[in-house]
């Protein structure tokens, strides 16, 4: 048994024996710590032990040759379970850069399986020892109590994308622990009030916000978003407020537990397409020093491919890298009980070692069928910076969903009044069946969104025609140029009453459209109270008021906040919007598309009015049908609209009419009954009606 193991050797003054080769990383076992790491091309591996926060190791333990099986080194070091220490590795091997092999035994190498990383003392502070990352062994014990995961159906998801720091860092957030996991915990009552049922956190794996630190016009710029990962198994220590236990992940676990207790799932934005090591000029602290030519896609002359736009690309379908990614996701699911993952630039995960797209990528298939990941939500950003665009065609095995970029682009254009878009907009609202039905995936594969961290906020989408990214320091050349936005008559903030009134209506139109569309829905934190980034559509480096949520706007735009709450509650109440698999008893189709004339879908070039009716069996009133009609008039003038006829005994009641501001939400005891099924819709407005029995 493990507890009966005895030392067999003494290395570097420590009692040791060959370790358990199946325990990746550093693991506390009875009597000591088990260290395991892999390298194909190294000829020598040395374990480095440091006293806390020391720059240089106090012990070097070279793995004896007998402690290596295949390409795996493993050693159990006795006594380390009783002392406080940090560790790293050193690898020696050939230096043949033309082949991508670049060993340097002088470099301290971070364990890729490290569960906690030492190197920075807090957010915005440079590394204590530049270029040096060390790891700690963590106590993973945590009492989850009787808490269970919500396990929500995919179609019911209303996802709230947030940045851990930006969500509460501004003083207006009113929380004690600003910019941390604990700060989000303090806002759980707010999330419950809003009604969302999933949070998607932008990257929380350990990253170095100082990695691209620079000054521009007396403004400090950081790697704020966190898409340059340093360590994939460790939470970002800067997001933790509990400095006593900040290397054990307890604060994140407490957040996940309390979100689950409130029926809210947790989705992580993960970045397996590249790392923080960059290109040939980038830092050297992990994969480069272990097996550079294994972990990264390299050209025939040893240079880095750059399909990520960030300097390097992980060689995801190489078996060793594939196993690493699987191990990582399994760890987050089992240790932190994460409910789902959104994969940044996921199309890279389907390329082979020279970048060629694969029909059935082994990694994506493994993730789809892995038993531990079964039931975990897998969401792809189905494109990359190398020009591969796979929305509607991402390899899925009926397990993968996609951020539907077509939904964002088509509906942004349609809602602002562009022509030739009625058919496309109708397809997007009704689950993008033109994209997903041919592969038998259904609308659950379409994660619908109009805003996310990339691009304008919803308020800015109707306040700016052009991006305003000068503060990023690239002379306004960064960020997308084609935003499909419309400033409603003035660029940026204005005192013009009519323009501001129109902007609010457009915001409500957009969100009502999202909530009345089939497929999981996602929106950006702060959209519910008109948060602004002042026209910056690429705030990746802005750790300031540009990217922090301004909570004073919640009171200023209370009507928008209340509208968001109402539409979220409406979507939850009428399940036929999200689940149209059951036909109505009256034999109406589950989904039907209309123009301003009922039962007639016209897609003329100048058509800017769409009506969608959902029909199905009511879950609350047994034996009865329910009907929801959503109409959007993107034209700038009134349009007379005819709603579909209903079965005998039913009539239409109007619930929402953004053309009737400020009373755009109609209280149920004051619902307008459309006896003749007609309404003169105002320009640039939406209506929502419910077919009810009388």
Which residue stretches match the model-derived regions?
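Core domains of carbohydrate- and sulfate-ester-processing enzymes
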Residues: 87, 91-146, 209-229, 281-303, ...
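Short, polar loop/linker segments at the starts of domains and inter-domain junctions
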Residues: 171-185, 464-469, 663-675
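Short, solvent-exposed turn/loop segments enriched in Gly/Ser/Thr/Pro and often Arg
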Residues: 202-209, 270-279, 345-350, 380-386, ...
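Carbohydrate-interacting/catalytic domains
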Residues: 1-160, 165, 186, 191, ...
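Conserved alpha/beta catalytic core and glycan-binding cleft of carbohydrate-active enzymes
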Residues: 114-117, 337, 353-354, 359-525, ...
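Substrate-binding/active-site clefts of carbohydrate-active enzymes
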Residues: 163-182, 186-338, 345-369, 435
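Hydrophobic faces of well-ordered beta-strands that scaffold small-molecule active sites
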Residues: 158-160, 199, 266-268, 341, ...
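Short, solvent-exposed loop/turn and secondary-structure capping segments
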Residues: 48, 98-103, 171-175, 203, ...
